[in-house]
């Protein structure tokens, strides 16, 4: 019996796994049926509809790091080169050729596309492979007779394994509904509608790429000062040289590093850092300030929002209060957004496998080579939490081809059609 892999969210990770599974089947190789459950549409989070962008900002990585990159498959001994060749049919370059945009893209110097164009590429691949998409929002995840069950208002999807993707909800904010506190979705909704933001003192909470994208947009609005609030001592620039990029596209040797070394590498290259392009814009704008601290709480008072910040100084916690006319909550993706969806049976299963409470730290440290929670059957794949254990490229767009290898090479349980293969990523037998 062919196994079923259900994926929550129809973004790049879902498309990458579905495309490789489709090509494996075209080669006559057993692969799971991939069913994607999506509330909005394929690539929605890369458009204004998803709330994470207005669709006009540029992709932060090279588009050539597409759904098959780095094209170094290790799933089918002696036929991996054939699999990679098949995957190039779904590459960024193939999309440009098929849509008569390739020559212009080359002549313009291979620019990063805007988010809207990236979403169009994902839809093009999904259409080409006939990706099975069930439209609906997952409201509950439970254990069923087959394995997992994903419950939407209209239907229930049963699967042998589940992969959870996506950044969570862009609507979350410190003070929901308050007109002086904007969520990520509120911000992009206004900019997509060409509404001018006018304020004296603006606070941007967050020091990562989500906040950076909003800062890049905010420069064009009528604000007097912008204070970026983050826990770091300063606004760090993301390392974008060859050696930093290699960490993302080739995780060989990552597991030989200590946890402390891995965390240090991730903080320097991925978490809480701005791209060099955004940093350059910050340098040219004297309205930008940085305030170190974590926001403990926010209260409206006297027509302003008062933020209480906690800062550690020499081991002592210091509390300060600051007032702003407008607060933008740009804290970004929540890798644990799915936890409230878990039914009690699912929580019990995961806590039993973890040997402790269901925390982000334990989940990260449990992620195995196949990007699933270790010690848990049926499989629950969490690539968004795989950075610490398996490599910093897995949670983002940096090695979608390797990610799909890991997941499709996993043992999906008693009903699985594929045996567990450990990928030999650096020099696969082809």
UniProtKB/Swiss-Prot annotation:
Q: Name one GO biological process term.
A: biosynthetic process
Question: Signal peptide: which range, if any?
Answer: 1-21
> Which pathway?
Siderophore biosynthesis; mycobactin biosynthesis
Instruction: List the coiled-coil residues.
Output: none
Q: Name one GO molecular function term.
A: L-lysine 6-monooxygenase (NADPH) activity
Any Pfam family hit:
Lys_Orn_oxgnase
Reaction catalysis annotation: L-lysine + NADPH + O2 = N(6)-hydroxy-L-lysine + NADP(+) + H2O
Write the Enzyme Commission number(s) for this entry: 1.14.13.59
Q: Which cofactor does it need?
A: FAD
Q: Which terms are listed as keywords in the entry?
A: FAD, Flavoprotein, Monooxygenase, NADP, Oxidoreductase, Signal
Please tell me whether the keyword NADP is annotated for this protein: yes
Keyword Signal applies: yes
Which protein family is it in? Belongs to the lysine N(6)-hydroxylase/L-ornithine N(5)-oxygenase family.
This chain's function reads: Flavoprotein monooxygenase required for N-hydroxylation of the two acylated lysine residues during mycobactin assembly, thus producing the hydroxamate groups necessary for iron sequestration. Is also able, but less efficiently, to hydroxylate L-lysine (non acylated) in vitro.
This chain belongs to which protein, by name?
L-lysine N6-monooxygenase MbtG
Q: Which organism is it from?
A: Mycobacterium sp. (strain MCS)
List the lineage, top down: Bacteria, Bacillati, Actinomycetota, Actinomycetes, Mycobacteriales
Gene responsible for this protein: mbtG
């Amino acid at each position: 019996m062919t196994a079923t892999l259900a994926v929550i969210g129809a973004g790049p990770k879902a498309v990458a796994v579905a495309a490789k599974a489709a090509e494996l089947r075209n080669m006559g190789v057993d692969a799971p049926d991939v069913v994607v459950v999506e509330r909005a549409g394929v690539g929605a989070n890369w458009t204004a509809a998803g709330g994470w962008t207005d669709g006009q900002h540029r992709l932060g990585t090279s588009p050539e790091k597409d759904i098959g990159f780095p094209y170094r498959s290790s799933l089918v001994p002696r036929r991996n080169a054939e699999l990679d060749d098949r995957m190039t049919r779904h590459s960024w370059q193939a999309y440009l050729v098929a849509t008569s945009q390739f020559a212009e893209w080359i002549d313009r110097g291979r620019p990063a596309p805007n988010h809207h164009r990236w979403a169009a590429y994902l839809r093009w691949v999904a259409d080409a492979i006939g990706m099975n998409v069930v439209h609906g929002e997952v409201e509950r995840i439970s254990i069923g007779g087959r394995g997992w069950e994903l419950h939407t208002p209209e239907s229930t999807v049963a699967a042998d394994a589940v992969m959870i993707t996506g950044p969570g909800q862009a609507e979350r904010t410190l003070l929901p509904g308050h007109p002086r506190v904007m969520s990520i979705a509120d911000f992009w909704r206004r900019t997509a509608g060409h509404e001018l933001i006018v304020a004296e003192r603006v606070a941007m909470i967050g020091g990562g790429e989500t906040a950076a994208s909003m800062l890049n947009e905010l420069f064009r609005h009528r604000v007097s000062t912008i204070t970026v609030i983050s826990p770091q001592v300063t606004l760090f620039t993301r390392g974008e040289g060859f050696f930093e990029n290699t960490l993302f596209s080739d995780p060989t040797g990552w597991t030989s590093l200590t946890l402390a070394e891995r965390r240090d590498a991730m903080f320097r290259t991925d978490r809480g850092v701005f791209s060099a392009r955004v940093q350059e814009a910050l340098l040219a704008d004297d309205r930008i300030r940085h305030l170190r601290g974590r926001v403990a709480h926010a209260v409206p008072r006297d027509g302003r929002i008062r933020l209480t910040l906690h800062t550690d100084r020499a081991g002592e916690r210091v509390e300060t209060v600051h007032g702003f006319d407008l607060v933008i909550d740009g804290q970004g993706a929540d890798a644990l957004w799915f936890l409230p969806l878990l039914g009690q049976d699912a929580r019990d299963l995961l806590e039993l496998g973890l040997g402790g409470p269901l925390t982000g730290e334990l989940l990260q440290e449990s992620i195995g080579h196949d990007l699933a929670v270790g010690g848990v059957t049926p499989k629950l794949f969490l690539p968004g939490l795989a950075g610490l254990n398996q490599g910093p490229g897995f949670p983002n767009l940096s090695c979608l081809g390797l990610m799909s290898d890991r997941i499709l090479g996993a043992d999906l349980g008693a009903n699985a059609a594929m045996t567990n293969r450990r990928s030999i990523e650096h020099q696969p037998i082809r």
